[in-house]
């Protein structure tokens, strides 16, 4: 009996016009990403076995739902910089970077095997607007705030999990993430990375508004204002997702 390769499993949206409608010019690069995810994502622990036939909707289109919100947040900025915290399998960072080639993305992920995956994806997709840092968020915050917050020299001392200096010295216009942590923790991992007037854009589940209520103190403590949740379209006829946003005062 022949073993079924995960790449042999058809995706429900393969060939759908929804893909081109939502992803536009990024579709070619994201097809490369989809093929790689279908073949390697489950055995490498990046997606669940039940996700293989719904990668387009659950992971790629869901991640792409934040793209309009990133564009809105950077519309008036000269430097369109985005940090993606806890990038994991590339959601939403790899997808958003493919959709926004005029933005510079920094993917932050602590796990070595996921870092290896992200580097492979960037190389195979030909993404030249992505840098990858193997680090936890607090070390990147130290690199940014130590260089820009008046603590002379401390930012230069910040190192990644391989002991290398973290090549980040400026706060970001936008910070993104998906399924990383509740807002009580996420506030302290993301908001300190934002430039003045920057914006956190996080993909969340149905409990997003409850998370805001529980994290009111943490959001304010870390300089966040105007926390809100909006329903974001994933694609025509598909279930929408939720985007949680917080501005940096």
UniProtKB/Swiss-Prot annotation:
SUPFAM superfamilies: S-adenosyl-L-methionine-dependent methyltransferases
GO MF annotations, alphabetized: rRNA (guanine-N7-)-methyltransferase activity
EC number: 2.1.1.-
Source superkingdom: Bacteria
One GO cellular component term noted in the UniProt record for this chain: cytosol
Protein keywords: Cytoplasm, Methyltransferase, rRNA processing, S-adenosyl-L-methionine, Transferase
Intracellular or extracellular location(s): Cytoplasm
Free-text function comment from the UniProt entry: Specifically methylates the N7 position of a guanine in 16S rRNA.
NCBIfam families associated with the record: rsmG_gidB (TIGR00138)
HAMAP family per UniProt: 16SrRNA_methyltr_G
Recorded family membership: Belongs to the methyltransferase superfamily. RNA methyltransferase RsmG family.
Protein name: Ribosomal RNA small subunit methyltransferase G
Gene source species: Bifidobacterium adolescentis (strain ATCC 15703 / DSM 20083 / NCTC 11814 / E194a)
């Amino acid at each position: 009996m022949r073993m079924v390769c995960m790449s042999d499993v058809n995706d429900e949206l393969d060939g759908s016009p929804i893909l081109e409608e939502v992803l536009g010019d990024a579709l070619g690069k994201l097809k490369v990403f989809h093929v790689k995810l279908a073949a390697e994502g489950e055995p490498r622990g990046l997606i669940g076995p039940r996700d293989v036939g719904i990668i387009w909707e659950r992971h790629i289109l869901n991640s792409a739902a934040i793209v309009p919100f990133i564009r809105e947040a950077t519309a008036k900025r000269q430097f369109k910089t985005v940090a993606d915290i806890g990038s994991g399998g590339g959601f939403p960072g790899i997808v958003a970077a493919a959709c926004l080639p005029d933005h510079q993305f920094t993917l932050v992920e602590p796990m070595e095997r996921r870092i290896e995956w992200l580097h492979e994806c960037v190389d195979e997709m030909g993404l030249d607007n992505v840098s990858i840092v193997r680090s936890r968020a607090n070390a990147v915050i130290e690199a940014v705030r130590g260089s820009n917050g008046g603590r002379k020299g401390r930012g230069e001392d910040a190192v990644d999990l391989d002991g290398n200096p973290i090549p980040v010295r400026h706060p970001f216009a936008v910070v993104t993430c998906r399924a990383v942590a509740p807002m009580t923790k996420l506030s302290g991992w993301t908001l300190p990375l934002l430039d003045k007037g920057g914006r956190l854009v996080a993909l969340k589940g149905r409990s997003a508004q409850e998370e805001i209520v529980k994290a009111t103190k943490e959001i304010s403590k870390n300089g966040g204002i105007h926390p809100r949740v909006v329903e974001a379209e994933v694609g025509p006829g598909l279930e929408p997702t939720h985007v949680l946003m917080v501005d940096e005062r």
